[in-house]
Amino acid sequence: MIIDTLSIIGITVAVVMAVLSLWCSPFRRKLRVATAGSPAAPQPLSLILMTHGNTQALSDCLPLWLNQEYAADLQIIVVVDEGDHQAEDIIKRLSGSHRLYSTFVPQSSRYMSRRKLAVTLGVKAARHDWVLLADADCRPASLQCLTAIMTHCQPETVNQTMVPMYYDEASRGFYQFERLHRALYYIGRALRGRAYSTNAHCLVFRKHQFMDGQGFLGSLHLLWGEYATLVNKYAAPHATAIALDEEARLTQRKPTTAEWRKDQVRALDTNRHLGHGGLYHAVYRLDQTALYLAYLLQIATSVYGALTQRWVMMGVAIAMLLLTVVVRVLWIRRTIHTLNIPMKLWATPFYELRITGHNALTWLRHRLTDKTEFTSHKL
């Protein structure tokens, strides 16, 4: 048994990297599900649903929104494309509800994002200051979903509320994990400073701030990322709430591989145009670097210890490697248990290691994509 200076250095490296890796985990911070302070009373609300041609999702989810048990006045506005007769038929079939209204996006809009035009038309049609914007395929978990979300909307201190979203149980595990992993960084920035972005297709904000800020001015040419640009432009320091309650839960159907990859590339392009993202990117890159560096050095130390018969160094390095894996998995388990997200726990260490490779492939796909896919400026 050899315990020399080199062994002490190897042991120190293994221990320090274990501590650094565990510190640099987005799952380390315990999520606060409960509303801070007294829950806000339900405010009059305008819910804007954007169809984007997804009539099947509208048919499935619109009745769930119309049947919401909401104590205050609720206006539901469905924004459809002009000439979308299937969506119009669905709205006519459900038009008996006094909550339901509709507007349309004209076909003549060519020089700006139709998605952002749809948002703008919906907000202008809203009669209440609090607006909840969502895609038509957002499925509420319960009849109290809107009530649960709006309890976080304190009028004096909150100007927007982010609602993290998850895929349904049929989704691939890595899709679910990647969405949660990215969302934790967005949630962290929102709770500890100023919100940077979101990967959910749902957001609560104030109509008067949207109108005073001239809507999407500055990003009208970007075809995608309406939720991310809204969060980035209108977030104020320490004024973004997060609705993590079980009853506030929203889910989306499982995307196809092609759809998921396109969403990832579009999100990457959108984030290139967002402001105040320095700290977000620094923390994200530090966490990824610490994860890989810890595993690499711990494995290298244990192998070197075995080859040179420094058994203590090898044993400590292996112990630190196992400790790193086990603690990270336990933190992931705590998070997915808190949020009640279906996921195979045994696969999560492999999902974590896959993140950087996935990001690299997304970057490559973005580089190979025609940039006119992201902007309405075709010059």
Regions found by a protein language model. Give the residues of each.
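Cell-envelope/extracellular polymer assembly enzymes that use nucleotide-activated donors
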Residues: 43-46, 75
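Acidic donor-binding segment of Leloir-type glycosyltransferases
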Residues: 63-109
